[in-house]
Amino acid sequence: MLPITTGAPTFDELLSDEFETLPGHPGDADRAANRLAAWCKSASSGDWALFRRRLARDGYSVDHVLARFGSARRALSASPGFNDEAWVRAAFIDVADRSAPYAGDCPFGHLFLPLIRTAEARLWASLDESISDLLLPSARNCVRQKLLGDVSALCAPVLYERFAEARNYGNFIAEMAPGGFLRLLDDKPVLLRLLASLTRQWLDTTHEFVTRLQTDIDAIRRDLLNVPHASAVARIEGGLSDPHRGGRSVLVVEFDDGLRALYKPKDLRIDAAWQRLVERLNARAPIDLRVAHVLARDGYGWTEFVGHTECRGSHEFASFFRRAGAWLALMHCFVVADMHQENVIAVGDQPVPVDLETTLQAAEESHSDNVDAKAYDAAREIISDSVMAVGLLPAYGRSAGDTVFAVGGVASDWATQRRLTWTDINSDGMRPSIKDEADRPTTNLAHLGGRYASLAEHLDDFVSGFEDYARFLMSTGLLLDGFAAVPVRKVVRPTQFYSMLLHRLKDDRMMDDGVRWSVQADFLARLADWDRDADPRWPLQRAERSALLELNVPFFVMQSEGTGITDTAGTVVPTSAKPGLQRARERMLRLDDRQIAWQVEVIRQAAASIDDQPKQLVPIDQAATPTQDAFIAEASKIAEEIAEAAIRRDSAAAWIGLGSVAASDVSQLAVLGHDLYSGNAGIALFFAAHAKTGCESSADNALAAVAHLRSELKSRNASHVIRVLGVGGATGLGSVVYALTAMSRLMSDDDLLADAHRAAMLLTDDLIASDKRLDVVGGSAGAILSLLALYADTGADDVLKRALVCAEHLAGADRVGLVGMSHGAAGCAYALASAATVSGRDDFADAARECIEFERANFDAERGDWRDLRVTEPHWRSQWCHGAVGIGLARLAMTKRAAAEPDTVLADIDDALIGATRGWPGHVDTLCCGTLGSIELCREAGRVLNRAELVERASRRLLAVLRTEAATGDYRWNVGTRKFNVGLFRGLAGVGYTCLREIDDSIPNVLIWE
């Protein structure tokens, strides 16, 4: 039977046949309209045309939804169920129970004791009395604390809002028990719904676990613990995995003799198959591997507890990474994914995978019929068929707050997690705070005496292990025996995305209405494919919503040789994906020396992204005399090189290269995106500039580079694409506007200008309001500069209006206290001053002046540079992104585009030139962080200030960079080599673009959004 919800039905429930529409009453229409508007905002960002299509996919009309949202009741024909909300609410009436002493560490724990004891009574009454022989009182208390902790975590934030006014804990508890808490539940019926749901999940999953433990205890002792004697359970620890499928999660079972085992409430046949495979391979393999021993049962199982232990000596660090490389070879062949830090435990010199559920992953389907997407899809397939897809190698992710974190089974820097903590719990001084979880144990890496091994130090060992084991697998047959017809987990979306939605659903501000609360989960609809009339994966969204509204992470499985995705209810959604077992067979057939060499190249590139060793400072010779031929030749050579690296399909091109992560200093191997900074728009702009030399192939390459982008701007999925991009002028939608505008000018192509205008109109008020970065690279400052460049070419009032909305957002926001062009005050000052010039608004000019004054206060006259405020230790950089170069360019640009105070600006330009000279030549040859940015400052200053010696200096320095490359074989990059550094701000396209600007001053300066 299903649970019956009384006071807070979700929108899915209300629109189902379980409910029926009632005649309307006064006020119902307003409530219905508010609910519908909230749904539209969540599902389509307020786009009513798109929202109507979303309704139609489920067979709804606006009129039907409004009628049901106005007034409805549970239908008499509705299926029978059980009403947990009734007895959960009734439990809080027990005042006597609340007077019992409580000395725990759960905030407001006193209030929840009646529910906990009522639920406990129901649980133990449903189990056999003999369970007391198996579970010691300490174990039963662990079970109890699990429910108490979950209930407290859910309710404490909303209770604290009320407690903060009283500040007397004893009086507050007396007031809330029972009347005050019951009134709270009446005011927020969703809170009661969630309390009932959590309690029901605890009852069902605990009953299931205890019953299974009682059934399997003898086998656990015999097959996993290797002990013949009986022992009782002393502790049960949870929190080792996200809750799935009705609150089920991994538990650690500790017996009174200290031995431990893991309970996993999911099918473990894939784990058992791995155990048999590794045991078979170890008999002949060049290096032995280890997996956890498994006791598989029907739909669940038990595994040995794998503890993190240190090496016997530092010599074992090398063997640890050889084994890690061997694991990568094996996992790559078996199409494993999601092998991040938490799924690997270092046991001495053995890296032990502890969760192999994402083995034999089916290929991701391409749902697009768009011919312009074929090149991108082909590039994405190359990445998904590489060792990067395993998740063992270091990579980077981006949090909701734009913080960059490292991921990967052999990564050393774990993501810093933020969590709610409480101080002075259950006292008058109790307070919550959000804290970073620091000093998390690096359990995935080998260690000795507190020192952890790193991949950077043992890369050759890792590569050796990979190569040796891959060649061993080439000569080994029947690898896939035992892997047919086994279920494997299918991760439909990143867990981090689900966590974001769960965070919203736990916010009590929407808990007064079940519909407005539940439509937050329909944010998923934004990610559907709206270019088609029907999205094959649309049915999965209902299952995702159902799980999320129970505060669970959605869970799906596929058969290893199948193509259908199965949800928790057993519903199968067919797909056209290539089955995982077929992919594994094909990989093993393709495995040869050439494939191994390519994968080793990928490994070394991934490892380079975590190498923080300082770049060698190479002397640069500036003695030669510059000639235009040298610059044209280098630009043409680079154009040819980038063109050869392209993946071409029909009229579109894509590249695999180093893409920046969240506008940060880190890069990783990926299919390049649409942006100007490191993506296709920047490459296209370089090709457009090179086309001015008369090169027809570069004109074709320029259009091919943005073909996919332009088609997406016109597609029904455009809102999702721009939401991922953000608004910024280097990495966001603003960068697209600027690139298309500049390309249209260089190529005399009005269609490109029309698409730039189309992109500008996608910068909606809602998207701008969501911008928290604010800077020129990723935020509103960059959007302003990009839009004003388009406005200069079109004079379109609607473009100017978008720019001024961005300026209002930037001027009214709390800007981050940083200096510099890319993320700091210089870029914001330039953008705001530019907006002030075109609008005549004093508030923008005042805000720009504040930014300049802030920057002046952080200038160090002795060093001739501005201090980098991102780090606590005194540090100075002379780059475009941070320091003198960018600040100087921003001030120079202000003299051209914006009204400014001449004396202050000119003084800053002089200081910037001094700082840039002291910082020359730096460690890299890029526009963003190195020599090319410094060259652009000299060139721009020479032209603006009519100082010929600066223009000459820029020319000589650029030639020196080219000559040094010719002597050493490559330019100096932030990460890796030229093969994957193809972008504009940090790659070859930037070198070529700088060369072209040397010979043609009509090519716009991209560093100031000219």
Give the role of each language-model region.
Residues 2-171, 177-214, 350-636:
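C-terminal catalytic region of ATP-dependent kinase domains
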Residues 104, 108, 176, 180-183, ...:
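Generic alpha-helix detector with strongest preference for long hydrophobic helices that associate
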Residues 118-336, 341, 347-352, 357:
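Conserved ATP-binding subdomain of kinase catalytic cores across diverse folds
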Residues 284-319, 330-368, 372-435, 454, ...:
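Glycan-recognition and catalytic cores of secretory/periplasmic carbohydrate-active enzymes
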